[in-house]
Curated annotation (Swiss-Prot):
SUPFAM superfamilies: DinB/YfiT-like putative metalloenzymes (SSF109854). Pfam families: DinB. Gene3D superfamilies: dinb family like domain (1.20.120.450). The lineage of its organism: Bacteria, Bacillati, Bacillota, Bacilli, Bacillales. Belongs to the DinB family. It comes from Bacillus subtilis (strain 168). This is Uncharacterized protein YisT. The keyword Metal-binding applies.
Amino acid sequence: MTDAKQFYDYHSWANKKIFTHIENLPEETAYQEVKSVFPSVSDVLLHMCRADYIWLNVLSGVAYQEIIDSAGKLQSAQGNMAAIKQHAAELESQYHDFFSRQTDLEQTFTMQHPKLGTLESTYADTILHVVNHGTYHRGNVTAMLRQLDHSGVPTDYMYYLYEKRESKG
């Protein structure tokens, strides 16, 4: 079984592919309104950053209300792709810091939610949730780009593995 850190590395790789692809499209593409689950591509990407931020804090043991109160700081990036990309890069670095501190990802921890209650999970399962959430929303981005008459970019896990293999020589 591949470990959760590799899946997180895939998540980061795929997000970078999306950001690079969007940077090569007309600038207005990221902000154009579409009829979809989010009003624009930039809104989806900001949502993904917010979710990654929230889950990193859950993994780090931060209390629910403190996470919710601090997640609003990402809102300043609304409508600013450069700021969203910067947040994504900072989050990637923070996740790698987490991985360096938490070496046993199969260890269980307890999370608290005011409505859903208490859940015991492993760090690995929670990281896989982060990756799965990102995969879902990268699919949203691709669908939105197609609505705007632009192609998507392949971000399937197998593309990551092929690229990883090629970079090893």
